[in-house]
Amino acid sequence: MEVILLERISKLGQMGEVVKVRDGFARNYLLPLGKALRANAANKTRFEAERATLEARNLERKSEAQKVADVLGGKSFIVVRSAGETGQLYGSVAARDVVEILAAEGFNIGRSQVHMNTPIKAIGLHAVAIGLHAEVEITVELNVARSAEEAERQTKGETLTSADAIYGIDEDALRPEDFFDPEADGNAEDDDA
């Protein structure tokens, strides 16, 4: 089905373009949400008549998104979750959790605006992309830790999943050279015991 886009849609096209999409995508998403019109002669003339107001509305939305981006962009948020010794979370931090964290800070972001390929399943510093508008995308940092103290240590650059952090063992002391004598003869008779 061919549709006329009423706003810029990422990976599809710019406002005013006539694009061919699958029927289900048009019927279930683009048309009901008012993001597109069916591409016929009547709708093309209607679009040209409303083009100026649509562009003004899009510009207004973009400027609002840019204001939020200026405040929110580059911020870091601490997420405290329970995790095992190796840093593996008992659960995960998903888009829903990111929305709740941002809402607690006073930002109104929808779950569909949070772009995460997979949920976060380990402690550490993680960058999360947020699409505020089709043309405005920012990145926030999530500091996932077991406690506020660990989050502070991670912020300073300490790795909490290393052997030293977990067991108090210096990883440099675990080199194979320290365990084996390269000069030793491998044909000792008491090896058969």
From Swiss-Prot:
It comes from Rhizobium rhizogenes (strain K84 / ATCC BAA-868) (Agrobacterium radiobacter). This is Large ribosomal subunit protein bL9. The keyword Flavoprotein does not apply. Signal peptide: none annotated. Binds to the 23S rRNA. GO terms for molecular function: rRNA binding; structural constituent of ribosome. The keyword RNA-binding applies. The gene is rplI. Belongs to the bacterial ribosomal protein bL9 family. PROSITE patterns: RIBOSOMAL_L9. It holds the Pfam family Ribosomal_L9_N. GO terms for cellular component: ribonucleoprotein complex; ribosome. Transmembrane segments: none annotated. Keywords: Ribonucleoprotein, Ribosomal protein, RNA-binding, rRNA-binding. NCBIfam families: L9. Residues 179-193 have a biased composition (Acidic residues). One of its GO terms (biological process) is translation.
